[in-house]
């Protein structure tokens, strides 16, 4: 009489659905720098946009000097944006009136189309940024009521 373990090993095995997505492995020793949406950052592409066929984008944003002025109110055309602060800090204002400082080791999720404004940063900064989908537009907008640009 077969044991439960033997019966389990002979059970039909599931076949996963197929996907054209690929593995992305970005080596720190061979960074791929790309043009980004802000001139005061350097952007390191992590290969996720291409590997996921545009489903997601991951990059590291690096600054070697603090912001001289706020970015201005804007929103991103995406489902969502996630950041993880690897080094330094950034202060962000949100349309609901909150100002949040994201410091080293902190993370923040920003829903798509939520108005916000980066107002200050540390002198050096590195942020892992992930967006869904990979293509994320940035649209300048008017400040929410009660805020100045």
Give each language-model segment a name:
Residues 113-114, 119:
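Short, surface-exposed secondary-structure boundary micro-motifs
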């Amino acid at each position: 009489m077969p044991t439960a373990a033997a019966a389990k090993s002979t059970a039909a095995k599931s076949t996963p659905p197929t996907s054209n997505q690929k593995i992305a492995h970005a080596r720190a020793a061979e960074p791929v720098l790309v043009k980004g949406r802000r001139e005061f950052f350097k952007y390191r592409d992590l290969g996720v946009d291409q590997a996921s066929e545009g489903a997601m984008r991951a990059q590291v944003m690096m600054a070697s000097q603090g912001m001289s002025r706020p970015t201005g109110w804007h929103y991103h055309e995406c489902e969502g944006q996630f950041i993880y602060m690897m080094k330094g800090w950034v202060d962000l204002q949100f349309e609901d009136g909150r100002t949040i400082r994201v410091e080293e080791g902190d993370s923040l999720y920003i829903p798509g189309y939520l108005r916000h404004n980066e107002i200050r940063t540390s002198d050096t900064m590195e942020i892992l940024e992930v967006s869904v989908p990979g293509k994320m537009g940035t649209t300048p907008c008017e400040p929410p009521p009660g805020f100045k640009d």
